[in-house]
From Swiss-Prot:
Organism: Haemophilus influenzae (strain ATCC 51907 / DSM 11121 / KW20 / Rd)
Family as reported in the entry's similarity comment: To the N-terminal of E.carotovora exoenzyme regulation regulon ORF1. The C-terminal part is colinear with YqcB.
Name under which the protein is recorded: Uncharacterized protein HI_1436
Biological-process GO terms, alphabetical: single-species biofilm formation
Coiled coil regions, renumbered to chain: none
UniProt superkingdom: Bacteria
Length: 106
């Protein structure tokens, strides 16, 4: 389960890089202070994936902490990025992560 999660996170990063969604500079420090789900008021969906979701999941993996067993990110990404032509390609690793977590106790 943990190895599969790591692989899906790596695939998400690779996909974001291939789609030119991966950024070299993080958002301003204030953007990370958001209390809204997905930091919707301070970050774009792809920024949130790169700078919040992926690092938090990696930190859980590295520390041996329990992974979330209920994840629902794809509906937000679908709505926030509905105009993005390669949306389905981006959703593939996200849906795989959701299915893995939602079908297993971590």
């Amino acid at each position: 389960m943990r190895n599969q999660t790591k692989q899906h996170l790596e695939q998400l990063q690779i996909t974001m890089q291939q789609l030119n969604l991966w950024q070299t500079m993080p958002p301003a420090a204030e953007a990370f202070l958001s209390e809204e789900p997905f930091s919707i008021d301070t970050m774009s969906a792809e920024e949130w994936l790169q700078w919040v979701f992926i690092p938090r999941m990696q930190a859980l993996l590295e520390s041996g902490s329990a992974l979330p067993n209920k994840i629902a990110i794809s509906p937000y990404i679908e709505e926030a990025m509905k105009e993005f032509n390669e949306l389905q390609q981006l959703l593939t690793p996200l849906v795989a992560l959701e299915e893995l977590x939602n079908n297993n106790e971590c």
